[in-house]
Amino acid sequence: MRIKSIITALALPIALAACGTGTEGELPKGEALANVAAPAGKQWTEVVSKTEEGYRMGNPEAKLQFVEYGAITCPGCAQFSVQSTEELNGLVNNGNVSFEFRPFMVHGIQDMPGFLLAQCNGPETFFPLIEALFADQQNWLGKISTITPAEQQQMQGKGPAEMSKFLAGKF
C-alpha cells in the first residue's frame, strides 16, 4: 500500500516535469496561403458537388478538406451549423478550404427525410436546405417523431420524390 501512495504522489511532479517549459521548440512558420479564385461569376460557397459519400462545398482541390459526419436530428450538429456557418463560409470562400457534409444516420429513419429533401433540387441547394433544417430543427423534429412504425414501413423503398410527397401529406 505504501508503494502505491509513493507512486501516486510522484506521478504529478513527474508528469509536469515531462511537459517542459515550452521554450525548447518553436511552432513551424510559413507564409499564409494565397486565396484561390473561384470560377468566374461565383463564390466558392456556390460551387457544390455530390461526392461519393455526401456533398462538398468549395474548391475540390483545396489544401484543407473539412468533413462533417452529421445527422439532421442531432442537436449538436444543429448547434454547430447555426454557430459556424458564417465563419465556415468565409473560410471556404478563400479557396483553401472545402467543406463536405456526409449524412450519418444517428437516429435511423428520423434522419432520412431531411437528407432526402435536401437532395431533391440538386447539389446547388443542398447546403442552404441543410442549414435551414438545422436552424428550425426544434420545430420540425417534434412533427417527425409522430411518424408511426407502420408509416416508417410504408416509407421503406420510396425514392426521394415519393418520400417528399408522403411527408408533405403528413405535415
Task: Locate predicted features.
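Long hydrophobic alpha-helices with heptad-repeat/coiled-coil character
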Residues: 25-28, 39, 44-51, 150-171
